[in-house]
Curated annotation (Swiss-Prot):
GO terms for cellular component: nucleolus. Keywords: Nucleus, Repeat, WD repeat. InterPro entries: WD40/YVTN_repeat-like_dom_sf, WD40_repeat_dom_sf, WDR55_POC1. It comes from Neosartorya fischeri (strain ATCC 1020 / DSM 3700 / CBS 544.65 / FGSC A1164 / JCM 1740 / NRRL 181 / WB 181) (Aspergillus fischerianus). Its main location: nucleus. The keyword Hydrolase does not apply. This is WD repeat-containing protein jip5. Residues 39-65, 352-414 are annotated as: Disordered. Residues 369-383 have a biased composition (Acidic residues). Belongs to the WD repeat WDR55 family. The keyword Flavoprotein does not apply. It is found in: Nucleus, Nucleolus. The gene is jip5. WD repeats lie at residues 9-48, 73-112, 118-159, 222-263, 319-356.
């Protein structure tokens, strides 16, 4: 189904990953507090220095990945990243208690927000940052707080306070998925979103606050994603939120029926409990694969679940020792997976013989990411946190041992 086109090594453990909504750009946040932004090569025909055209340079392994900028953005780890809805701004949040808004193209910081401290006065470390619209930024923290900020208010010590704060869960918020705007929406932006935290799912409204919280699911809910266009039948409208659990099970929730799940899909069965489903992404319809979810596992694999059939139909391996932290599809339909100290870019497999599940997925590249050119306006001192101290509460399971892998990558990588 997918095969790696390149492997991009990082200088430290990946804690967060974000894909630009309009351009082939990926940003990463690291355990050291660094934020780095890369431009991926285009799948479309391009022209070399002699004026000759080369088709799909990223497929033949000769494209360039350009480092647009790199800086030590936070004095602790960079826990979360998110682009604005138009891609102009990149929001990052770190364990230093700050949210920073920077120009996506240059990395220059234009705004800062101090995260409200925990009740004991300590830093309330962030877990999610999400731009809901050009006006609203959502920020979730370890203490289970969900802060809403009005981005139209210029920064000042006073205006840095959130406009609203909710507590939809008793535990920290592990995922946030916006619901599509209603047919009567005049703005075209979402005003409701689903969150998971601890063992519950909740729905929050921009104006009315927390609307509903589910029954206790008796397992930790880790990740979530919305998928529409499914087959409608009976009371089902063909719109669901898919939730990944800590024991290898996907649960399906009918939009509007939030009290309890209505279907279960076993993604990874193991004795004593399955592997945690760390991150989810909808496979773009343009790829012609039907309605499908990509699932990033704590064991380092990525499994593909076909909706309707409700079963795993294919699998690739991101890494054999590190879990998948980031997973998504760029504007050209390439899958981007991140975890450990590597980001991988995948394209649709060429000359597939139908044995997608048997494809080798972990292709390595010589060299390592340079740490010599830290650009930007932030501090670049040598403060480094251990992964154990800075990682969110949930531990990643690891498989022992590592198999041999082929070598493939882009030339002239920065």
């Amino acid at each position: 189904m997918f095969d790696t086109v390149c492997t991009l090594p990082l200088s430290a453990d990946l804690f967060s990953q974000a894909l630009h909504p309009k351009e082939p750009i990926v940003s990463v946040g690291l355990s050291t507090g660094h934020v780095q932004t890369f431009r991926l090569p285009s799948e479309e025909s391009d022209t070399d220095g002699d004026g000759a055209e080369s088709t799909s340079s990223s497929r033949n392994g000769k494209g360039h990945i350009d480092t647009m900028w790199r800086t030590r953005r936070h004095k602790g780890s960079c826990r979360c990243l998110g682009f604005g809805v138009d891609g102009e701004m990149l929001y990052s949040a770190g364990t230093d208690g700050l949210v920073k808004a920077a120009k996506a193209e240059t990395g220059v910081v234009e705004n800062k927000i101090a995260i409200p401290p925990a009740k004991d006065g300590s830093v309330d470390a962030p877990t999610i940052v999400h731009a809901l619209s050009p006006q609203t930024l959502l920020l979730a923290t370890d203490s289970s707080a969900l802060h809403l900020y009005d981005l139209r208010i210029p920064f000042s010590p006073v205006s840095a306070r959130p406009q609203q704060t909710h507590h939809p869960h008793d535990d920290y918020i592990s995922s946030l998925t916006p619901l599509p705007p209603s047919d009567t929406s005049t703005s075209g932006f979402s005003k409701q979103w689903v969150t998971t935290g601890g063992t519950t799912l909740a729905v929050t409204d921009l104006r009315r606050g927390v609307l509903v919280r589910s029954e206790d699911q008796e397992e930790e809910l880790v990740s979530s994603v919305y998928i529409g266009g499914l087959r409608a039948s009976g009371t089902s409208r063909g719109e669901k939120v898919v939730v990944g659990g800590s024991s290898g099970v996907l649960t399906l929730w009918e939009k509007g029926a939030w009290d309890d799940q209505d279907e279960r899909i076993y993604v990874q069965r193991e004795a004593g409990g399955g592997e945690s489903l760390e991150t989810l992404a909808v496979v773009p319809d343009e790829l012609g694969k039907g309605k499908m979810i990509a699932v990033g596992l704590g064991s380092g694999g990525v499994k593909f679940v076909r909706m309707g059939m409700n079963k795993v139909v294919s699998e690739v391996m991101h890494d054999e020792t590190e879990g998948v932290i980031g997973l998504g599809f760029d504007v050209e339909g390439r899958m981007v997976s991140g975890g450990g100290q590597v980001v991988k870019v995948w394209h649709e497999a060429v000359d597939s013989d139908g044995m997608d599940g048997d494809m080798a997925g972990g292709k390595r590249m010589f060299g390592s990411d340079s740490d010599d050119s830290d650009d930007g306006d932030d501090s670049d001192d040598s403060d480094r946190e251990s992964r154990k101290a800075a990682q969110p509460q949930r531990k990643k399971k690891k498989n022992k041992g590592k198999g041999g892998q082929d070598i493939m990558g882009f030339a002239d990588i920065d």
